[in-house]
Amino acid sequence: MIFDEDSNSVTQDSGYMTVGNAYSNAVGYISMSDHWSKLTKPSSIKVESNGASPNKADLIVEPLESGFALTLGNALRRVMMSSLRGFAVYGVEIENVLHEFTSISGVREDVTDILLNISMMRVKLSGLSNKVLSLRVKGPCEVRSGMIPDTDDCIILNKDLLICTLDQDVDFNIKMYVNSGKGYVPAVKRKSVSKLSDVPVNFIATNALYSPIKKASFKVESSRIGQFTDYDRLVLSVETDGSILPDEAVALAARILQDQFQPFINFDETDEPHKKIDTKDALPYDSNLLRKVDELELSVRSYNCLKNDNITYIGDLVQKTESDMLRTPNFGRKSLNEINELLASMNLHLGMKIANWPPESIESLSKQYSEE
């Protein structure tokens, strides 16, 4: 390998490779948008129910560039667990109780146990940021969260939660203060604030867990586009408390990340030099539609099925429905999945309607696209 100071170049002495001033001409112009637009993006996000509850679901995202499933999965999970806002009970008033280190006559649990139970109560407010819930019960009975009546602006999500047990014929009167927030706020932190606020003398702060996410995990699997298997599939498993749906939680986490990343983008995309509009841009069809199906990395069985059905161009293929394809002789579910994945990688799908197809002189148009 020889370094030439005059030409500012490095030449491999075997003659197979030259790196120098001519390198940029060989590579060509790279636009700013190429850095993100050339990457493979997920064609769809599939939501699969995980059990009978609508609060549990798996979100399957594919295809992703290699390594992106781990990057995105970890970021989305951490944001969901830490930063989504929800509702929680942050304090209570219990009749004839001045502090948490006491017991109530006729009540099996002491006040600390009652506060612990109440901290697990899940609430959803609509159109409000805070509310006071009141409950009056006469024993003997079990006091459960479902005894608090639902209203138009407040719903108790876990109605079977045990608050306390009344063993005798006693009255149990309690007020619960609900507000919105994020993360976990311990009672100790709330007490320091309540001293400065106008709160009742018998107000008792509780630990408040605002996060609407009960569980969130992810796993990374392999995905494929045609014959290429070096892509990622991200499977996000999310369980919420019922105040939001799992796919809504993921969408909110993605929006938070988008907002946090925005300050790092220190350029204006409108400043990018305008590219010369070539003939390819002026033509009315997506270039992929004018490609022939024999250019795709299809299995022999799938290709022969398309050929026997007189499907020559991708534009012919995408206008077929899944039912049409499955009626093709020797064409099975495996071939259908293969074609769906390939079309998805080009942002196409079966069952599309394309006006004025096929175009006149389709052969020359296809050749023009392939040359460019």
UniProtKB/Swiss-Prot annotation:
GO terms for biological process: DNA-templated transcription. Coiled coil: none annotated. InterPro entries: DNA-dir_RNA_pol_insert, DNA-dir_RNA_pol_RpoA/D/Rpb3, DNA-dir_RpoA, RBP11-like, RNAP_asu_C, RNApol_insert_sf. The keyword Coiled coil does not apply. Pfam families: RNA_pol_A_bac, RNA_pol_A_CTD, RNA_pol_L. It catalyses: RNA(n) + a ribonucleoside 5'-triphosphate = RNA(n+1) + diphosphate. One of its GO terms (molecular function) is protein dimerization activity. Residues 1-268 are annotated as: Alpha N-terminal domain (alpha-NTD). It comes from the Bacteria. Keywords: DNA-directed RNA polymerase, Nucleotidyltransferase, Transcription, Transferase. Residues 280-372 are annotated as: Alpha C-terminal domain (alpha-CTD). Its EC number is 2.7.7.6. HAMAP family: RNApol_bact_RpoA (MF_00059). Homodimer. The RNAP catalytic core consists of 2 alpha, 1 beta, 1 beta' and 1 omega subunit. When a sigma factor is associated with the core the holoenzyme is formed, which can initiate transcription. DNA-dependent RNA polymerase catalyzes the transcription of DNA into RNA using the four ribonucleoside triphosphates as substrates. The N-terminal domain is essential for RNAP assembly and basal transcription, whereas the C-terminal domain is involved in interaction with transcriptional regulators and with upstream promoter elements. This is DNA-directed RNA polymerase subunit alpha.
